[in-house]
Amino acid sequence: MTDILPQEVWLANFPFAEDETQSKNRPVIVLDVDDETCSVFSMKVTSKKPYSEFEIELFDWAEIPLDHISTAVASQVIEISKSKFIKRIGRLSNDDWENVNDLHNRYLKSIGQIF
């Protein structure tokens, strides 16, 4: 498998938050990588605008390339096995990468993970 790197967007088998025995292949943004797992943002491919303070629209979604306006959801950051990654879609623009990291840090502060 190709190396998986932060800032990349991959198609991966992502478990549902409500029932982790169920999953869906969906785009994810890679935040961090270690030997066996990757921390990823869930990315809902939707034409709807973000509705939570912990969601952000990707401005350069077409350059990745994705088919639709896409929203990154900070409350759904999880670690998933590299074996769940299917194929590389592309890479976030530097502006979107900065926005995603800022969103992630704001979310972590809100739940007391960082101060």
Can you name each region flagged by the protein language model?
Residues W61-F115:
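C-terminal terminal-subdomain/extension
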Residues E18-N25, V30-E63:
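Compact nucleic-acid interaction/catalytic patches
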